[in-house]
Swiss-Prot record:
GO terms for molecular function: alpha,alpha-trehalose-phosphate synthase (UDP-forming) activity. The lineage of its organism: Eukaryota, Amoebozoa, Evosea, Eumycetozoa, Dictyostelia. In the N-terminal section; belongs to the glycosyltransferase 20 family. In the C-terminal section; belongs to the trehalose phosphatase family. It catalyses: D-glucose 6-phosphate + UDP-alpha-D-glucose = alpha,alpha-trehalose 6-phosphate + UDP + H(+). It is an enzyme of class 2 (transferase). The keyword Transferase applies. Transmembrane segments: none annotated. This is Alpha,alpha-trehalose-phosphate synthase [UDP-forming] A. Keywords: Carbohydrate metabolism, Glycosyltransferase, Transferase. Synthesizes trehalose 6-phosphate, the precursor for the production of trehalose, the main carbohydrate storage reserve of the dormant spore. Trehalose accumulates in both prestalk and prespore cells and then is rapidly metabolized during terminal differentiation of stalk cells, while being stored in spores, where it serves as the principal energy and carbon source for germination. It comes from the Eukaryota.
Length: 733
């Protein structure tokens, strides 16, 4: 074990293997003239960010090209031996449609708030699914019980769900390196639900900023209908943690670079070249989200409004080539070059160009020198996940205390409070901010720079990586502890059922026998379910009861002719299997409270579009399933507060709020049934749904009790079924 292994375990408490999954491996491959393959480590943001974690570490990703079957064995051995990497071999078609088609043609523009640029079709979606399938198969093949799987970015949003299907105990985390858009933007995506369900199969989901996490949580509520908390989502029978982890850089790399002779000589050359001139630096990929046209328009406005800067200010704009084969990027390049030409033509002269435009990649030494000699950095992204250029600029400003002018639409803006914040769409504001930043007093420059430097040197790439792994390890351990509710072994229960002498089966209705329906009247039992109950009820050794919030009339019609017991309006009324008559649990009940409740329910129904209420003999139920999920929940909480002040029993259901007299207990009748059945040899009780009885409540019963939760509801000491379909399967058996 090396020093970095100890670092990972000491910092995170995790001693197993970490499997990192990203679209591309951090390695480029090349076939040499002798026919042998060679590999070379590549650079990149994720490579740098994960460098502090390099320990018992496996990286899974695409190799970047289609590889012939005959070469795959050699490449796999080479990558594993030298780099602990495992390649995923995709066909050229799948790779292109997955990466260029769906990931960058659909998800990238949508997540950066440009839904008009979507180019969606089923063909590229199918390739996205196929690529995620192939990645998950590679991970599943190498996965061991104590491993952590860390999935990266928008290319792999289906992988967690697919991997969970193959390996149910997998401990998976997901981190999104780009913004997550508001739910109003995200819902444009045709496959929006599949994407959300894909990453919800994680223990931990990470974002750069609180805004991105909040947008994700709202999408889970609005699109999937899930209940959320500020730090996570209730999904199936567990809590998926959602956290904020702003990524950083490796400052030491830049500090060391600044000390080299090569960089110092270059700094000296650049200072001599721009002596007497203020220098602005812009380093961006040539991408429409980076706001380079907006930056150039602001520079043009600066020269118009403050002509004194002519001849005294230059912008060095590096535009790193990106996706040059895509038409939109070609148009962007043309637009940028035309703006550069126009500004240099209007405000330049012989020997002076206000904009030095470089359409090329710049090596790290040159980049460090450019950062160092600049008086200010200008970042005008119209939407950016984080933007690490801002942090790189800060650590290279060792003497100058340069000013960081930063778009408020970057993720970095939420962390770098010492920057001058701008709205890149407000050309006037950006021009003024440049002017004021270049004239900022030295004391203020130093104060802002020290604030920024303190943050960047603390929140490094290593800090980010170790922090995420630590939280993932903790979240997956908590998930393991939470899963105390056993999945019901249906075959085992059926065997116990067959061996028992007398059984009592008690079912809830909505959400247990039938899925919740936006229109309650449409939740009729299927003919198959009715047939199953008819068969069960004709067995002299079996008693069946259904507990429901429905009224007597509805239940009588639905289960007409079937000899089962029924409880209506959450226990207000009760009917024995052999009877057609309903009994009122509490005779001569005072219902004067209904006159107070009726106007209150009407008031909240009018205030909450999509909601409605039902008035039954002894029960009011307010339904808000069809309301906006967030607003509906807020209104339900407020209504609950009003009801808490009244001497009534409030029943909180799934998107419902019910009210009845406080002296009614739906289990009272059932306990009487159980007590009456015990002398007849009762030795098995199944309670399925949200009604549960602890054995201690039945001191004279010494048989078996199965409390079975359905769906997301979890009760201690109970078993669990996922949905009504599994309940129906149990009944049929």
């Amino acid at each position: 074990m090396n020093e970095n292994d100890n670092n990972l375990e000491n910092e995170t408490g995790f001693s197993g293997r970490l499997i990192v999954v990203s679209n591309r491996l951090p390695v480029s491959i090349k076939k040499e003239s002798n026919g042998k393959w060679s590999c070379k480590m590549s650079s990149g943001g994720l490579v740098a960010a994960l460098s502090g974690l390099k320990s018992n570490f496996i990286w899974v990703g695409w190799i970047g090209a289609e590889i012939e079957e005959d070469d795959r064995k050699e490449i796999k051995e080479l990558l594993w031996k030298d780099y602990s990497c495992i390649p995923v071999f995709l066909s050229e078609k799948v790779a292109n449609e997955h990466y260029n088609g769906f990931s960058n043609g659909v998800l990238w523009p949508l997540f950066h708030y440009l839904p008009g640029d979507l180019d969606y079709d089923d063909r590229i979606w199918n390739s996205y699914v196929e690529a995620n399938e192939q990645f998950s198969s590679v991970v599943a093949e190498i996965l061991k019980p104590n491993d952590l799987v860390w999935v990266h970015d928008y290319h792999m949003m289906l992988l967690p769900e697919i991997l969970k299907q193959k390996k149910p105990d997998a401990r998976i985390g997901f981190f999104l390196h780009i913004p997550f858009p508001s739910s109003e933007i995200f819902r444009v995506l045709p496959c929006r639900k599949e994407i959300l369900l894909g990453i919800l199969n994680c223990c931990l989901i990470g974002f750069h900023t609180y805004d991105y996490a909040r947008h994700f949580l709202k999408s889970c509520t609005r699109i999937v209908g899930l209940e959320t908390a500020p730090n996570g989502v209730y999904f199936k029978d567990r809590f998926v943690q959602v956290g904020v982890f702003p990524v950083g850089i490796d400052p030491d790399k830049f500090f060391e670079s600044l000390k080299t002779t090569q960089v110092q000589n270059r700094i000296k050359e650049l200072k001599e070249s721009f002596e007497g001139t203020k220098v602005l630096i812009g380093i961006d990929r040539l991408d429409y989200i980076k706001g380079i046209p907006q930056k150039l328009q602001a520079i043009e406005r600066l020269f118009q409004k403050y002509p004194e800067w002519k001849g005294k200010l230059v912008l060095i704009q590096v535009a790193v080539p990106s996706r040059q084969d895509v038409e939109e990027y070609q148009k962007l390049k043309k637009e940028v070059e035309e703006l550069v030409g126009r500004i240099n033509g209007l405000y330049g002269s012989i020997g002076y160009s206000p904009i030095h435009y470089l359409f090329q990649s710049v090596d790290p030494s040159e980049l460090t020198a450019l950062y160092n000699i600049s008086d200010a950095a200008l970042i005008t992204s119209i939407r950016d996940g984080m933007n690490l250029v801002a942090q790189e600029y800060i650590v290279c400003q060792t003497e100058n205390n340069g000013v960081l002018i930063l778009s408020e639409f970057t993720g970095a803006a939420q962390s770098l409070s010492g920057a001058v914040m701008i709205n890149p769409w407000n050309t006037e504001e950006v021009a003024d901010s440049i002017h004021n930043s270049l004239l900022m007093p030295p004391e203020e420059r130093e104060e802002k720079h020290q604030m920024l430097l303190k943050y960047v040197t603390k929140h490094t790439a290593s800090h980010w990586g170790l922090g995420f792994v630590k939280e993932l390890n903790k979240a997956s351990s908590n998930t393991d502890k939470m899963v105390t509710i056993q999945k019901l072994d249906i075959e085992k229960v059926v065997d116990i059922y067959k061996q028992s002498k007398r059984r009592l089966l008690i079912f809830a209705y909505d959400g247990t026998l039938i899925p919740y329906n936006n229109v309650p009247q449409l939740s009729r039992p299927s003919q198959e379910l009715l047939n199953s109950f008819d068969i069960l009820s004709n067995d002299p050794k079996t008693d069946v009861y259904i507990l429901s919030g429905r009224d007597k009339k509805t239940l009588s019609e639905w289960f007409l002719g079937i000899q089962i017991g029924l409880s209506a309006e959450y226990g207000c009324f009760f009917k024995l299997p052999e009877s057609t008559e309903w009994e009122q649990q509490v005779p001569s009940m005072d219902l004067s409270w209904k006159e107070t409740i009726r106007p209150l329910f009407k008031y909240f129904t009018l205030r909450t579009p999509g909601s409605f209420f039902e008035e039954k003999e002894m029960l009011f139920t307010w339904h808000y399933r069809n309301a906006d999920p967030i607003f509906g929940s807020i209104q339900a909480r407020e209504l609950h507060l009003h009801l808490d002040n009244l001497p009534l029993d409030v029943i909180v259901g799934d998107k419902t709020l019910g009210v009845r007299s406080y002296n009614i207990n739906p289990l009272s009748s059932m306990k009487k049934v159980i007590t009456d059945t015990i002398p007849k040899g009762l030795d098995l009780i199944l309670l399925i749904g949200d009604t549960h009885i602890h054995p201690s409540e039945l001191p004279t019963f010494d048989g078996k009790i199965f409390n079975i939760s359905v769906g997301k509801k979890s009760v201690k000491d109970s078993y669990h079924l996922s949905d009504p379909a599994e309940v129906n399967y149990l009944i049929i058996n």
